[in-house]
């Protein structure tokens, strides 16, 4: 999937998509704000949130210079929605990939469980960010309306028309294969390998460039992480932790869900959610077996907690760091205080919604 994303970026797909949507809303700031939030969430369902923010934030900065508005509110909203969108599917945020592959859940399982929670939460989050920033957005829209600007044509973003068409077809095929993999019997890993091979063949002489741009550090990190977690599992430490949660909750499933969800969210706000999720998987597995509760319920609580909790602080998720860095390069500093003032309440709201929806659906 990394190779596919690099191939799409190479031909200008992401910049074209952003510019196309901006043109559709006639470059008005408020509709643009809402559109980019929704776009961020949708793209993050299939593409890693770092890539989504890299391109969305860059285009946001470019449009802010044209339309004379402060890009910080839009970048913050995009970052949160990227993390939220990633929670909706198995191939979104890395914790979901780990949870899905370790516990045997499919793309459809995530889409019909965490995806429903993410979809409802997205509506609430859009309203939240609009209420928080509506005065600033309205002022920016009024200023933009008074200026005469020439806007770039979306087609200018396409660097290779033939490659653009091929990359779009490959992306659509990937989406179809991921959505239907439970029915076809194809594993997510097989689909990823197939898509990467097709992308490399389509890239031709640029195939080596795509291979060089793969994030090998992340891949090696995953390999090492699984080895460490396997070692912890063998020592029995994780079973002790599972028993501890079981003792605290006293076998009460409602309390178990709350503990897993909120501990995951709080921990992920300060530590990398990937190793945390990997560590928690055998814990919830042991907890499920010991307390005779449905493992999937605990898995959805873990997924939502780790995916959303990272949004609360600037260091909680990689997408946050990328968004802040992009804004800083353009001269817009986002300090801890400003970030947490906006993002922490949004995180609490979504984690609260997640808990209530899990209660309503499974208890």
Kindly label every feature range from the protein language model.
Residues 66-72, 76, 88-91, 108-159, ...:
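Juxtamembrane and boundary regions of transmembrane helices in multi-pass small-molecule transporters
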Residues 122-206:
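Long, contiguous bundles of hydrophobic transmembrane helices that form the permeation core
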Residues 18, 51-62, 75, 89-103, ...:
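Re-entrant/interfacial helical elements at transmembrane boundaries that shape
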Residues 30-38, 52, 75-76, 111-115, ...:
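Hydrophobic alpha-helical transmembrane segments
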Residues 30-34, 78-89, 147-155, 218-232, ...:
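Small-residue-rich segments of transmembrane alpha-helices in multi-pass membrane proteins
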Residues 1-70, 217-290:
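Membrane-embedded alpha-helical segments and adjacent helix-loop junctions characteristic
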Residues 89-94, 173-179, 225-244, 309, ...:
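Hydrophobic alpha-helical transmembrane segments in multi-pass integral membrane proteins
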Residues 29-41, 68-87, 119, 253-267, ...:
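Alpha-helical transmembrane segments of multi-pass membrane proteins
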């Amino acid at each position: 999937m990394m190779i596919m994303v690099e191939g799409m970026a190479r031909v200008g797909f992401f910049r074209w998509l952003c510019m196309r949507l901006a043109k559709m809303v006639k470059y008005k700031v408020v509709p643009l704000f809402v559109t980019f939030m929704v776009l961020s969430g949708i793209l993050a369902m299939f593409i890693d949130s770092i890539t989504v923010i890299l391109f969305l934030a860059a285009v946001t900065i470019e449009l802010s210079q044209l339309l004379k508005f402060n890009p910080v509110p839009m970048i913050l909203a995009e970052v949160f929605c990227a993390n939220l969108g990633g929670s909706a599917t198995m191939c979104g945020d890395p914790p979901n990939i780990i949870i899905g592959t370790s516990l045997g859940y499919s793309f459809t399982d995530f889409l019909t469980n965490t995806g429903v929670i993410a979809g409802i939460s997205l509506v609430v989050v859009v309203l939240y960010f609009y209420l928080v920033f509506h005065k600033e957005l309205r002022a920016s829209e009024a200023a933009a309306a008074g200026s005469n600007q020439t806007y770039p044509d979306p087609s200018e973003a396409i660097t290779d028309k033939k490659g653009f068409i091929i990359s779009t077809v490959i992306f659509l095929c990937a989406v179809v294969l991921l959505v239907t993999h439970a029915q076809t019997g194809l594993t997510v890993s097989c689909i990823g390998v197939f898509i990467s091979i097709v992308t490399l063949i389509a890239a031709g002489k640029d195939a080596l460039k795509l291979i060089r741009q793969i994030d090998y550090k992340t891949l090696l990190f995953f390999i090492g992480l699984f080895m460490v977690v396997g070692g912890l599992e063998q020592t029995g430490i994780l079973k002790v932790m599972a028993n501890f949660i079981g003792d605290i909750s006293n076998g009460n499933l409602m309390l178990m869900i709350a503990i897993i969800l909120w501990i995951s969210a709080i921990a992920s706000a300060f530590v990398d959610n990937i190793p945390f999720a990997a560590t928690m998987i055998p814990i919830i597995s042991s907890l499920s077996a010991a307390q005779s509760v449905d493992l999937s319920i605990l898995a959805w609580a873990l997924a939502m907690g780790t995916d959303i909790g990272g949004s609360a602080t600037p260091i909680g998720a990689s997408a946050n760091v990328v968004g802040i860095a992009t804004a800083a390069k353009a001269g817009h500093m986002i300090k801890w205080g400003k970030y947490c003032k906006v993002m922490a309440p949004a995180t609490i709201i979504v984690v609260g919604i997640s808990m209530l929806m899990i209660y309503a659906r499974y208890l």
